[in-house]
């Protein structure tokens, strides 16, 4: 009973935190709007050298798009260096080499830095570190393979480094395929919530925020002063961000400067991505929280940093909540005790607390859509899907959370990019890279049936008060499990035709 009570209180506080984020957004969002007059003079002979790093690993479908959008950046050729940090193990290497040679012949300062064998260590962080050792830029912009920076990205972001305290500038992620399928529509809600509300709330309130691994630009001095890229976590971006902020560096975030990206259109890719983000953030919490708590910092910064670092703890809390539901129902029935025997004030107060906490995330995501889209009400139809996949990945993320807490190491499994840009693109024809089906799908269906069984138990015992949230959990687990099996069938069919291969882990 005590564990369940603590679990409920913890979930409540995570829910309340979403209200705080919305409040801080409304109060301070103007700080995260760029200044139109702050644009580079392209004729200035004193413009700084900028290095653009493009870390890739087996990106056959999208490497050409990545390079083409990067060479289109508006910046003097003699002040722009491009590094393709290639850890690929397939024909992407040859394709990349040909592309680099083509643009070199056109006068671009572009380099193909391919790591192979024993040199390919440290995942993405290792590649960024290797590239930085030979980079000539004073500033380093980073774009993952699924991103397409606008030509004016550098023109709009570099001017903010006039403030010597600024160590990094991050921009908002946009979407090129948000409307491709139900899954991408739901994911766009989640991404918009983070980038439109959370990042603005933190940066606008002068709280700590994080570089999101891509679509941002660093001052090289800041990276070096903060200890450089380290690869003992799966979220090297989160880790470096907090180490830099502990050193006193300031970050800027702009919600009106957008870098478009491709959203994973397959549930297996989404689950793999969430596993990495969850495990990496908890690894970063284990690594840095002791330092943060000991640091001489205002409590408002410390408290938000704690919540930010452990935010993925909501998923194991969900699992605990589910698993304890049936035993508590039975204990309540066998003991003869009824919650209805409690004073009405306690009953009403408890109901109000639970309702306020659970509604918070829905308000949070709905508000992000309201700030972005005039037709936001029409888009609300996909909010329940976000809630379903958010609960359905609780099994995957609980495993990630436990592995991080227990110090279990795992390989960096990057998210496959399939160049799904238009609604007419056929997903089944882009099966070259796949994430294999794993045992999580079995646990997802088991949890779905457990929730369903607890629903029937609630009715049988005459205690239907928890049926609503159990039904949502059940739908979430069944939906994610169904999508996983559906994709597995596609992959099986593709493998019969020899058009698929499992994506190897990145060393």
For the regions a protein language model found, what residue spans apply to each?
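Membrane-embedded multi-pass helical conduit in multi-pass membrane proteins
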Residues: 3-7, 25-27, 35, 39-42, ...
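N-terminal signal-anchor transmembrane helix
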Residues: 20-79
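Loop-to-transmembrane boundary segments
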Residues: 62, 294-317, 422-452
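Acidic donor-binding segment of Leloir-type glycosyltransferases
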Residues: 68-118
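The conserved acidic donor/metal-binding loop of glycosyltransferases
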Residues: 88, 144-148, 232
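A short, conserved beta-strand element in the Rossmann-like catalytic core
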Residues: 90-91, 147-149, 174-176, 239, ...
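Long helical/loop segments within the catalytic core of UDP-sugar-dependent glycosyltransferases
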Residues: 100-139, 151-234, 245-246, 267-306, ...
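Catalytic donor-sugar/metal-binding loop of nucleotide-sugar-dependent glycosyltransferases
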Residues: 232, 241-260
């Amino acid at each position: 009973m005590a564990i369940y009570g603590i679990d409920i209180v913890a979930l409540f506080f995570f829910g309340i935190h979403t209200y705080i984020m919305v409040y801080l957004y409304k109060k301070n969002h103007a700080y995260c709007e760029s200044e139109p007059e702050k644009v580079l003079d392209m004729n200035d002979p004193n413009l700084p050298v900028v290095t653009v790093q493009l870390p890739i690993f087996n990106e056959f479908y999208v490497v050409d798009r990545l390079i083409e959008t990067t060479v289109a950046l508006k910046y003097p050729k003699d002040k722009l260096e491009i590094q393709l940090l290639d850890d690929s193990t397939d024909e992407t290497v040859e394709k990349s080499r040909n592309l680099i040679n083509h643009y070199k012949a056109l006068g671009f300062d572009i380099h193909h830095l391919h790591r192979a064998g024993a040199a390919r260590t440290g995942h993405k962080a290792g590649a960024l570190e290797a590239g930085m050792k030979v980079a000539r830029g004073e500033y380093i912009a980073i774009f993952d393979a699924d991103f397409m920076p606008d030509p004016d990205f550098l023109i709009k972001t570099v001017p903010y480094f006039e403030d010597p305290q600024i160590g990094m500038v991050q921009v908002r992620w946009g979407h090129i395929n948000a409307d491709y399928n139900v899954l991408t529509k739901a994911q766009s809600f989640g991404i918009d919530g983070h980038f439109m509300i959370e990042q603005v709330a933190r940066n606008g309130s002068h709280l700590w925020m994080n570089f999101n691994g891509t679509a941002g630009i660093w001052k090289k001095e800041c990276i070096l002063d903060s200890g450089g890229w380290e690869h003992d976590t799966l979220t090297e971006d989160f880790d470096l961000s907090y180490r830099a902020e502990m050193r006193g560096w300031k970050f800027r975030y702009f919600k009106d400067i957008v870098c478009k990206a491709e959203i994973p259109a397959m549930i297996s890719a989404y689950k793999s991505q969430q596993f990495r983000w969850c495990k990496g953030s908890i690894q970063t919490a284990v690594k840095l929280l002791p330092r943060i708590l000991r640091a001489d910092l205002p409590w408002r910064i410390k408290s938000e940093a704690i919540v930010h670092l452990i935010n993925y703890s909501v998923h194991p809390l969900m699992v605990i909540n589910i698993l304890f539901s049936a035993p508590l129902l039975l204990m309540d029935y066998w003991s003869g005790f009824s919650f209805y025997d409690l004073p009405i004030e306690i009953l009403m107060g408890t109901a109000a607390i639970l309702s306020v906490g659970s509604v918070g995330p829905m308000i949070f995501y709905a508000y992000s859509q309201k700030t972005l889209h005039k037709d936001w009400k029409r888009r609300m139809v996909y909010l329940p899907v976000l809630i379903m996949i958010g609960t359905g990945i609780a099994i995957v993320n609980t495993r990630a959370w436990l592995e991080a807490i227990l110090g279990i190491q795992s390989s960096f499994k990057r998210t496959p990019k399939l160049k799904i840009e238009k609604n007419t693109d056929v997903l089944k024809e882009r099966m070259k890279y796949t994430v294999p089906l794993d045992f999580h799908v079995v646990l997802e269906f088991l949890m779905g049936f457990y929730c369903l069984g607890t629903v029937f138990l609630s009715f049988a015992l005459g205690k239907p008060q928890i049926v609503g949230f159990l039904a949502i959990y059940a739908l979430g687990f069944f939906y994610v499990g169904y999508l996983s099996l559906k994709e597995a069938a596609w992959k099986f069919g593709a493998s019969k035709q020899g058009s698929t291969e499992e994506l190897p882990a990145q060393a």
